[in-house]
């Protein structure tokens, strides 16, 4: 007997079911990370620029920049922007590194020249003091004269005593004996290349009116001394400064009205002292400030290498 299967079973089709799992991908990132990265890059650039500026300028220039940022005035005519100092019109040439032996030799030469200049200056000031003392002795003014060698130069004090006054009381009219002394001193001061400062001092006796006071009197007396020196042949460019101190620097503070407080001081400056004054008042700034800074930098490098 022929087997006949179930037609329904024979005619049925096999259905294959495929299950597909869909993965949800994260959405696209926004542009916030670009902003953060740009801020980070800008901050790093500012940091590197600051480090470069600090490394490019010298110590004195850094102090000038700091003073300018704080609104302070600086003696060498400051007001220059730091960019003017570190951004030259032409790119700087690459620095050549000198051999240690050459650097040390140059440092020794500088130290030797500085020592010779100091020795020469001290010798000249000593000879000047001897000449001034001789002139004062011949004029019988030993009691009116004092001299002192200080780091800035030779300090010459010509003062009143109980017997003689250099000027008429309360006036800038110079007395004959003091004029004679200044005339004798003029060629002595002119014999050296050193500049001089003339300063007037008074005692503490006050004026009755405020129109003319001890400031005016001390300044006028210093100017009178300068005028006599120049009339005696001393060049006018020999005087670097004329100043008035009134009664601010009394020699005899216990006796403010003492005659010894009334005096004229003549300071014969060393070369370094006059250079410092040029620096303070802004003249010859490039010729004075930069060499001093370079000299100090070289001395610092030399001291670090010898440690």
Swiss-Prot record:
Disordered: region residues: 87-108
Bilayer topology annotation: Single-pass membrane protein
Cell compartment(s), UniProt: Cell inner membrane
A Gene Ontology term for the protein's cellular component: plasma membrane
CDD domains (UniProt xref): OmpA_C-like
Pfam families: MotB_plug, OmpA
The entry's keywords: Cell inner membrane, Cell membrane, Membrane, Transmembrane, Transmembrane helix
Domain OmpA-like: 154-272
Function recorded in the entry: Part of the flagellar gene cluster Flag-2. However, the Flag-2 flagellar system could be inactive in strain 042 due to a frameshift in lfgC.
Family assignment from sequence similarity: Belongs to the MotB family.
Protein name (record): Putative flagellar export/assembly protein LafU
Species: Escherichia coli O44:H18 (strain 042 / EAEC)
